[in-house]
Amino acid sequence: MEKQRLKAQLSSLRVPLFSVPWPGQCSNKAEVVEARMMKWADEHNLLVTDEYRNRVIRTRYGLLAARCYPNAGEELLQVIADYLVWFFLTDDLFVDRVEVATDETIRNLTAMVDVLDLNVAGSPPVFGELAWLDVCQRLRRLLQVEAFERFAQGMRLWATTAALQILNHLRPTSVGIQEYQTIRRHTSGMNPCTSLADAANKGSVQACEFYDADVQTLVRQTNNIVSWANDIQSLRREIHQPGQFRNMVTICAQQGQSIQDSVETTATRVNKEIAGFCGLADAVTARPISDELHGLIDGLKYWIRGYLDWVAHDTMRYADHFIESDADDRRFSAPDLSLLNKSCSSVTESTSSLV
């Protein structure tokens, strides 16, 4: 009933555009990185059917990496692109576009945490686990130890707060905005992404600067801007998903607003975060800070603008034309792992050599 009421209002929905006062950038390696990312996803059996492969091609995750990390070295940029395609696919297949909870949900999510904690894959691995191990081992080689742990902690919180998101969808009505914001801050996947912003520019920020209260506020504002803007941009598709569909817009609608008014309320929140980020970034960079911290703040700006430009110019992930086919992944959610394990034997050998 909740979904049907929302769907009835979608045909006349107007989606606002967001702007920020700094230019976008894009790595000149974008197309090369995109092509290598597709090859890597193929080698790790992430593209489960031709239909799924075509979806990934039109989504352009490599372009997202190139826009959000324009100054990254080629090796780091490649592993980030590979991470992004892995993250979006597993988030869709494990959480968003399947039933709210399945028999495999806990096993899938704990396997992702175990790769971070133990640096090995399970036997047999779940879907995407060997690809995830490969990403983590490459990042361990490229990042300082503490910098990798920032990334890892963000991913652990993604996997664990996914359970809170599932619990929210098992309720007859959603939790309120405050609780949702807490869940969204971690299920968005933005914390692992922003944790790489310094290394992709001028090098890893020391802990004393990274954990400064103002710097963490900037990180949180970046997360909010991207996550809440995405709640608007992905609304039409998410309402058609079989499981997860509640977000900031639908929660506002649950409280009595029309869906259009709920979009405008959410957009106002996004613009307020953008204004707050701009003011605080100016204040922090006016202080005597390290080059690495300047690089981190630049990296946060790249992420905000890069994401907005990716949605506006590159990706078909949220395109109306593909909503019906892309919103429901239940037909893809259980690849035959016995076949997967046989075809992954060579991948297992190559990743184990990196330990």
UniProtKB/Swiss-Prot annotation:
Protein name: Sesquiterpene synthase MAA_08668
Gene3D superfamilies: Farnesyl Diphosphate Synthase
Species of origin: Metarhizium robertsii (strain ARSEF 23 / ATCC MYA-3075) (Metarhizium anisopliae (strain ARSEF 23))
Job of this protein: Terpene synthase that catalyzes the conversion of (2E,6E)-farnesyl diphosphate (FPP) into sesquiterpenes which are important for fungi-environment interactions. Produces a mixture consisting of 9 sesquiterpenes including gamma-cadinene, delta-cadinene, alpha-cadinene, alpha-cadinol, beta-elemene, (E)-beta-caryophyllene, germacrene D, nerolidol and an unidentified oxygen-containing sesquiterpene.
Site feature location: Plays a critical role in the stabilization of intermediate cation: F88
Keyword Magnesium annotated: yes
Keywords (A to Z) from UniProt: Lyase, Magnesium, Metal-binding
Motif DDXXXD motif: chain residues: 91-96
